[in-house]
Amino acid sequence: MSNTRVHNPSASILSDFKEITKMRLAISVVFSSVAGYFLGADTIDFVTVTLLAIGGYLMVGASNAYNQIIERNLDALMDRTKNRPLPAGRMSVPVAFTIASAFTVLGLVVLYVINPKTAMFGAISIFLYVSIYTPLKTKTPLSVFVGAFPGAIPFMLGWVAASGSFSIEPGTLFMIQFFWQFPHFWAIGWWLFDDYKKGGFFMLPTGKRDRGTAIQIILYTCWTILVSLIPVFGVTGKLMLTPVSGIIIFLLGLGMLYYAIRLFKEKTAEAAKKLMFASVSYITLLQIVYVLDKFIREWI
């Protein structure tokens, strides 16, 4: 029996489409937006939820496609990214640009159907990510600070979609995800430091895998935990958190802090990788706890 594998062009095209839009990342961003919507909605409108998910996915996919167009030559230098559709030559720039442009237009239209402010914040996010954050990545470690702004929008975007306005509640959600960006992306920058160096990317605050970077990771992890607990004290409007849920969030934060301290002690790529996964677990579980806390308070 022959072991020859038949090449499936359709499967290859679909795979490249998923990669140029970073489907898995887009889905995680949609999760944040939907969580924010559940927190801000007085009654759940599943049509709005669907529009938010579709619009959010399209905007994130567009940002990722534009990013890969801009960085295609640098991606070719790094082991992690050299097999992406553009540097590998499986997709042309015009095709990628067409995908990005179509996603942008469709995404903005879908978000505008929800309400104008949701579309406005979606547009701000894609502009900051593509036009400012992406070019800065090869110029200064401050790119992480700039990138934290569009990166923090999805969680608050859901609340804006539910309420049609920006106030202290979505502002708090924004701050939680804003501070979280720093330990998360610095952990990635430490873990993949050698590969990023090949592409000329500046990801760590000191530019090195050193004590200074590790200390800043610990500090921003602490800030993330503290900001996450503010709703417990009843000072963030309709966004509230019961003491029990606050304790759960605090314990989750201690778990993330544990891995940040381990990175400080070990200063290894493996420790950074573990912190990266811990940070993803933290923000995901935090959003779940926030949503469950709201629903339980309403049911009791």
Swiss-Prot record:
Record-annotated membrane-spanning stretches: 20-40, 43-63, 94-114, 116-136, 142-162, 173-193, 215-235, 241-261, 276-296
Membrane topology: Multi-pass membrane protein
Listed name of the protein: Protoheme IX farnesyltransferase
GO CC annotation: plasma membrane
Catalysis: reaction(s): heme b + (2E,6E)-farnesyl diphosphate + H2O = Fe(II)-heme o + diphosphate
PANTHER family reported in the protein's UniProt record: PROTOHEME IX FARNESYLTRANSFERASE, MITOCHONDRIAL (PTHR43448:SF2)
Additional information: Carbon 2 of the heme B porphyrin ring is defined according to the Fischer nomenclature.
PROSITE patterns: UBIA
Subcellular location: Cell membrane
Main location class: membrane
Enzyme Commission identifier(s): 2.5.1.141
A GO MF term: protoheme IX farnesyltransferase activity
Key words, A-Z: Cell membrane, Heme biosynthesis, Membrane, Transferase, Transmembrane, Transmembrane helix
Name of the gene: ctaB
Protein family per UniProt: Belongs to the UbiA prenyltransferase family. Protoheme IX farnesyltransferase subfamily.
Biological role stated in the UniProt entry: Converts heme B (protoheme IX) to heme O by substitution of the vinyl group on carbon 2 of heme B porphyrin ring with a hydroxyethyl farnesyl side group.
UniProt cross-references to NCBIfam families, sorted A to Z: cyoE_ctaB
Entry's Gene Ontology BP terms: heme A biosynthetic process; heme O biosynthetic process
Record pathway: Porphyrin-containing compound metabolism; heme O biosynthesis; heme O from protoheme: step 1/1
Organism classification: Bacteria, Pseudomonadati, Bacteroidota, Flavobacteriia, Flavobacteriales
